[in-house]
A protein has these predicted regions:
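Amphipathic alpha-helical interaction segments
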Residues: 17, 59, 91-95, 99, ...
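Short, hydrophobic secondary-structure boundary micro-motifs
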Residues: 73, 109-115, 186-187
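Amphipathic alpha-helical packing segments from all-alpha helical-bundle domains
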Residues: 73, 103, 121-163, 167-172, ...
């Protein structure tokens, strides 16, 4: 079986520089106000390099969101409980929902931009594969690899506790609520505590409802 070629050092440097420049611009600009030209200038690379690497501005924002969510992915797959393996499914679900709300709270504007633009799925799975930074043209929020991972994990944990319910749809409902304007406004004004408590209450009610 052939192994994937390692990235060239200059390609790795360019990718890091582009993502770092985007992070810096996001500190003072809304995502939709950031252009590829601005990113290229801040990163010290040509505009064509950004397009070649990420395909579009949406592709760039998607790749950055994957980077920001990677720590949560690693915590779920190989970290300590309750996020990681080893804890009961119920505890893992509640811990994961708390963690998702924290990530959403720290990335409100970026997530809103990706939802607004209908961010498409990169060829990468969100596990750090650099070759998949480019995006397809047409997609939906649920095609985003971060969303797919979150949804799959939530639905799996719910199904393990309640095989009699539609775990996939419930996971969509829980995640969809976190992208709604009232919840994003609450996160911006007051932080994650109130939405987190509400989502935990909903999850407990679902798990404890009579069969």
């Amino acid at each position: 079986m052939s192994q994937a070629r390692p990235e060239r050092a200059d390609a790795v440097r360019n990718r890091r520089a582009i993502l770092a420049a985007t992070e810096e611009l996001l500190a003072t600009h809304r995502p939709r106000d950031i252009s590829i030209e601005q990113v290229a200038q801040a990163a010290g690379v040509g505009k064509g390099t950004v397009f070649h690497r990420f395909g579009s501005r949406t592709g760039l924002m998607t790749a950055l969101m994957i980077e920001r969510a990677q720590a949560l992915t690693e915590a779920v797959t190989s970290g300590p409980p309750p996020l990681g393996p080893g804890a009961p499914d119920r505890e893992r679900l509640l811990a994961f929902l708390d963690a998702v709300i924290e990530v959403v709270g720290r990335n409100k504007s970026l997530l809103a931009e990706l939802a607004f633009s209908g961010a498409a799925e990169p060829a990468a799975t969100g596990q750090g594969a650099a070759a998949g930074d480019r995006t397809a043209k047409d997609g939906h929020k649920h095609d985003h690899p971060v969303y797919r991972f979150w949804h799959g994990h939530i639905s799996t944990l719910i199904a393990a506790q309640r095989p009699d319910v539609d775990a996939e749809m419930i996971a969509h409902v829980l995640l969809g609520a976190l992208h709604s304007e009232p919840i994003l406004a609450c996160l911006a004004a007051d932080g994650p505590a109130r939405p987190a408590a509400a989502v935990r209450a909903l999850a407990r009610a679902i798990l404890d409802a009579p069969g």
